[in-house]
From Swiss-Prot:
Disulfide bonds: none annotated. Binds to single-stranded sequences participating in DNA replication in addition to those mediating transcriptional repression (URS1) and activation (CAR1). Stimulates the activity of a cognate strand exchange protein (SEP1). It cooperates with T-AG and DNA topoisomerase I to unwind template DNA containing the simian virus 40 origin of DNA replication. Residues 1-38 are annotated as: Disordered. Residues 69-157 bind DNA. GO terms for cellular component: chromosome, telomeric region; condensed nuclear chromosome; DNA replication factor A complex; site of double-strand break. It is found in: Nucleus. InterPro entries: NA-bd_OB-fold, NA-bd_OB_tRNA, RFA2-like, Rfa2/RPA32, RPA_C, WH-like_DNA-bd_sf, WH_DNA-bd_sf. The gene is RFA2. The modification Phosphoserine is found at residues 27, 122. This is Replication factor A protein 2.
């Protein structure tokens, strides 16, 4: 991966998020459930400054609820505990420590081997480099007064375009939450309150578009599973739903953009919220 300049030379984003937490006409339990099951692009500053208005309630930042979040940043430090690692990640607005558990049976032995020259020996630690960019997905929690990302999925970033794209998503969603932009899905979600998706004119099934079928299939497959060790591959979706892989890939991209699923091991495997 190419070497980049310090993150704060590029980053000026200080806000973001998908949902406006103010009540709107017609809002209710279904809208609350939608927020809980939606991935929100944020900055680390938003995570650190978020507050709980009520005990055990959702975290709120910039007029929006934060449940599952994603953010990008630079790895500043790696602490290897063989069975898990702690990554210190900074994005120009703040710094946070994220723990990732290893699934590799050889990590206990490899943890004492520093022959790689990087100061850490486990297989999970060698997936990351100090100074490299990563994207983090997970549930926002707090333990002992400290913000944590639970069930964290951490993906190395190979292209700086992904960092810029994330910043644009944060700006867009912050604008929606603050009322400066309209929610793009608002007109679709207000269609009798039945669907968040625009109807697929090419759909020939009984009332379900490929987008909806893929989301329902992914949710069913991911129920009770851990995103660190399980994902739904595109070929499985294609074979199970009798859809061509191009259609599945395009739908997965749309669902990712909408915050309902996210890529895990690579861009061909997804986990549903």
């Amino acid at each position: 991966m190419a070497t980049y300049q310090p993150y704060n030379e590029y980053s000026s984003v200080t806000g973001g998020g998908f949902e406006n937490s103010e009540s709107r006409p017609g809002s209710g339990e279904s809208e609350t459930n939608t927020r809980v099951n939606t991935l929100t692009p944020v900055t680390i500053k938003q995570i650190l400054e978020s507050k709980q208005d009520i005990q055990d309630g959702p975290f709120v930042s910039h007029n929006q609820e934060l449940h599952h979040v994603c953010f990008v940043g630079v790895v500043r430090n790696i602490t290897d505990h063989t069975a898990n690692i702690f990554l210190t990640i900074e994005d120009g607005t703040g710094q946070i420590e994220v723990r990732k558990w290893s699934e590799d049976a050889n990590d206990l032995a490899a943890g004492n081997d520093d022959s790689s020259g990087k100061g850490y020996g486990s297989q999970v630690a060698q997936q990351f480099e100090i100074g490299g960019y990563v994207k983090v997905f997970g549930a926002l929690k707090e333990f002992g007064g400290k913000k944590n990302i639970q069930y964290a999925v951490i993906k190395p970033i190979d292209s700086f375009n992904e960092v810029l794209t994330h910043h644009l998503e944060v700006i867009k969603c912050h604008s929606i939450a603050s009322g400066m932009m309209k929610q793009p899905l608002e007109s679709a979600s207000n269609n009798n309150g039945q669907s968040l998706f625009v109807k697929d004119d090419n759909d020939t099934s009984s009332g379900s578009s490929p987008l909806q079928r893929i989301l329902e299939f992914c949710k069913k497959q991911c129920e009770g599973k851990d995103a660190n060790s399980f994902a739904v591959p595109i070929p499985l979706i294609s074979q199970s739903l009798n859809l061509d892989e191009t259609t599945v890939r395009n739908c997965c991209t749309t669902l990712t953009d909408q915050g309902f699923i996210y890529p895990t091991f690579d861009d061909n495997n997804f986990f549903a919220l």
